């Protein structure tokens, strides 16, 4: 999808921006003209993304608005609240686009999964999105600004997967959370949608054995794994006014897997 500068007046906060889908989303939104606040648990990785965008520390000029990196653990309430405060202090406004990409896996079969691995995945993947969405919504409502909140779920949240009861539950929760938020915030001109990637070539997918990936590819009608830019293109659409009458939707980016 070619850039159309649909977001030239937007400020986008992207969590999980240090790699994979989060980095691709940051690049895509910047190409659309948005200023980008790139957040990651790994602050150095977030800074690398900002440099890639042409922000502070880069030898090239920023292609659009100002860019900045932020370090935060989105699973902690105080940290999530402080993140929004820091972003507003830096850019002098709340983010009008919020994309929650931060996520982890701790895979194990149900019979052997530890409570700690369950709690960690739920804390980042579901609680983290709740906290960031809540803080961003509070900032937008207080300022009277419209916005678009986009939560990265997963097709696994819809169909489940062996060895991923924690991950599947967290991503299913994101879908339900997104729909509830869409109902609550529509009156404030704030939209909320989720994106359900399939198997995407990311650092997380690199942990999957090749023979498993080969089997998955054989199940995909498009015949190949997706790339982070495929997800980022959909996010850019949902962030823009081209999707102005879309809220509460769950958009699958799977190449036809599990349809």
Curated annotation (Swiss-Prot):
NAD(+) binds at residues 13-21, 40-41, 72-74, 167-171, 200-202. Keywords: Fatty acid biosynthesis, Fatty acid metabolism, Lipid biosynthesis, Lipid metabolism, Mitochondrion, NAD, Oxidoreductase, Phosphoprotein, Steroid biosynthesis. Its EC number is 1.1.1.n12, 1.1.1.62, 1.1.1.239. Disulfide bonds: none annotated. It is an enzyme of class 1 (oxidoreductase). Substrate binds at residue 154. The modification N6-succinyllysine is found at residues 158, 171. It catalyses: a (3R)-3-hydroxyacyl-CoA + NAD(+) = a 3-oxoacyl-CoA + NADH + H(+); 17beta-estradiol + NAD(+) = estrone + NADH + H(+); testosterone + NAD(+) = androst-4-ene-3,17-dione + NADH + H(+); 17beta-hydroxy-5alpha-androstan-3-one + NAD(+) = 5alpha-androstan-3,17-dione + NADH + H(+). The modification Phosphoserine is found at residue 58. It is found in: Mitochondrion matrix. GO terms for cellular component: mitochondrial matrix. It holds the Pfam family adh_short_C2. The active site is at residue 167. GO terms for biological process: estrogen biosynthetic process; fatty acid biosynthetic process; protein heterotetramerization. SUPFAM superfamilies: NAD(P)-binding Rossmann-fold domains. Pathway: Steroid biosynthesis; estrogen biosynthesis; Lipid metabolism; fatty acid biosynthesis; Lipid metabolism; mitochondrial fatty acid beta-oxidation. One of its GO terms (molecular function) is estradiol 17-beta-dehydrogenase [NAD(P)+] activity. Heterotetramer with CBR4; contains two molecules of HSD17B8 and CBR4. Belongs to the short-chain dehydrogenases/reductases (SDR) family. Required for the solubility and assembly of the heterotetramer 3-ketoacyl-[acyl carrier protein] (ACP) reductase functional complex (KAR or KAR1) that forms part of the mitochondrial fatty acid synthase (mtFAS). Alpha-subunit of the KAR complex, acts as scaffold protein, required for the stability of carbonyl reductase type-4 (CBR4, beta-subunit of the KAR complex) and for its 3-ketoacyl-ACP reductase activity, thereby participating in mitochondrial fatty acid biosynthesis. PANTHER family: (3R)-3-HYDROXYACYL-COA DEHYDROGENASE, SHORT-CHAIN DEHYDROGENASES/REDUCTASES FAMILY MEMBER. This is (3R)-3-hydroxyacyl-CoA dehydrogenase. It comes from Sus scrofa.
